[in-house]
Curated annotation (Swiss-Prot):
Source species taxonomy: Eukaryota, Metazoa, Chordata, Craniata, Vertebrata
UniProt subunit comment: Monomeric.
Catalyses which reaction(s): Fe(III)-heme b-[protein] + nitric oxide + H2O = Fe(II)-heme b-[protein] + nitrite + 2 H(+); H2O2 + AH2 = A + 2 H2O
Name of the protein: Myoglobin
Family: Belongs to the globin family.
One Pfam short name: Globin
A GO cellular component annotation in the UniProt record: sarcoplasm
Highest taxon in the source lineage: Eukaryota
Gene Ontology biological-process annotations: removal of superoxide radicals
Residues holding nitrite: 65
Record-linked Gene3D superfamilies: 6.10.140.2100, 6.10.140.2110
Length: 154
């Protein structure tokens, strides 16, 4: 289920746009995640109290965490599927400490796609969307495999 060189190029081209405003993109991704799937908010002790979108937008902690999430994801995407070293600590913390189910990674993947569609319609056409979906699925599948190795049934 690997991506072609052309698909990776599409992914990295749009990711360059994301890196121009990591905090803005990250904040938007988390807001979409929490609004679309409120149950995910329960996994974040420091954000549980944020119920309204305006509260989320005003939270510097949420913006900071969004930056952290997208920085980590960008590092993984740039490895073009050769991301085992980057993935291992992420899988470890998300399985053992945070206990984030794979389903929630699907939810955040959807939010990422939606944010990219919204913010970069000219650079995120059908081909780029398909490539990004494949890249995020590869990431999720590899995380799920690591979860299994760790005995986490997320």
């Amino acid at each position: 289920m690997g991506l072609s060189d052309g698909e990776w190029q599409l992914v990295l081209n749009v990711w360059g746009k994301v890196e121009g405003d990591l905090s803005g993109h990250g904040q938007e991704v988390l807001i979409r995640l929490f609004k679309g799937h409120p149950e995910t908010l329960e996994k974040f002790d420091k954000f549980k109290h944020l119920k309204a979108e305006d509260e989320m937008r005003a939270s510097e902690e949420l913006k900071k965490h969004g930056t952290t999430v997208l920085t980590a994801l960008g590092g993984i995407l740039k490895k073009k599927g050769q991301h085992a070293a980057e993935l291992a600590p992420l899988a470890q913390s998300h399985a053992t400490k945070h206990k984030i189910p794979v389903k929630y990674l699907e939810f955040i993947s959807e939010a990422i796609i939606q944010v990219l569609q919204s913010k970069h319609p000219g650079d995120f056409g059908a081909d780029a969307q398909g490539a990004m979906s494949k890249a995020l699925e590869l990431f999720r599948n590899d995380i799920a495999a690591k979860y299994k190795e760790l005995g986490f049934q997320g």
